[in-house]
């Protein structure tokens, strides 16, 4: 049985898939296997096959903040957007979100429930898994500020890790030092707020972001880290870049 046939037992598999189809910057060569696992159990089986065949892999979110080489990647890309993309709101304002969830969709649904905490995220075109990996944020807020814990697949075992175990800082998490760990679920604590105020703030911040980073144009997203003294965007504008 071929590697593709083995993988297709547990996933949808695209061979020689152009990465430019899967990044917001619309660049990237082809990858040998682009994989959509059917569920969490299937993901574990896919990872086992890749390990047995010594196939390198990356887990990709929605392709923002990613620069892919034009050189073909002889390995696999695993995408969780199609199957691990559910989220739930508990009565006390806890949001439980799988790794493939859209950050924008989560922010909108939180607003509909008058829950505050994700207004800054209404224009960020990433997934919750990618957001937790790099601690996505904007307007002096970020995911870690609202995080309770993360469900992680590591060493073929699923476990929950509390926020204080995850070494969160500005655009940093422990996951960047453990690239063999796979983020499955995040849990966040949101608070009750005024729906009109939440909506107005989301609208203004989304409009500001879309004016600089339109979603309908090839764009890598906000890729520069902010120095402490002055925002990166201000430096770029003053330099005329």
Question: What are the roles of these predicted feature ranges?
Answer:
Residues 110, 128, 132, 136, ...:
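Short, well-ordered alpha-helical segments in soluble proteins
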């Amino acid at each position: 049985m071929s590697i593709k046939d083995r993988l297709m037992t547990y996933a949808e598999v695209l061979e020689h898939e152009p990465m430019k189809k899967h990044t917001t910057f619309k660049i990237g060569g082809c990858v040998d296997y682009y994989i959509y696992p059917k569920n969490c159990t299937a993901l574990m089986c896919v990872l086992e096959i890749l390990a047995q065949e010594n196939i390198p892999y990356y887990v990709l979110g929605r392709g923002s903040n990613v620069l892919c080489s034009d050189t073909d990647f002889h390995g696999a890309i695993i995408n969780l957007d199609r199957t691990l993309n559910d989220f739930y709101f508990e009565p006390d304002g806890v949001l439980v979100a799988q790794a493939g969830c859209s950050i924008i969709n989560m922010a909108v649904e939180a607003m509909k429930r008058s829950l505050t905490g994700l207004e800054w995220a209404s224009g960020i075109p990433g997934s919750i898994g990618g957001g937790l990996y790099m601690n996505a944020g904007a307007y002096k807020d970020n995911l870690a500020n609202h995080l309770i814990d993360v469900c992680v697949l590591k060493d073929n075992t699923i476990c929950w890790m509390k926020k204080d175990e995850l070494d969160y800082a500005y655009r940093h998490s422990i996951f960047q030092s453990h690239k063999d760990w796979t983020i499955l679920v995040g849990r966040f604590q949101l608070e009750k707020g005024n729906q009109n105020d939440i909506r107005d703030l989301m609208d203004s911040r989304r409009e500001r972001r879309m004016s600089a980073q339109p979603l309908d144009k090839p764009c890598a997203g906000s890729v520069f880290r902010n120095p402490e003294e002055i925002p990166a965007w201000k430096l770029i504008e003053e330099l005329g870049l």
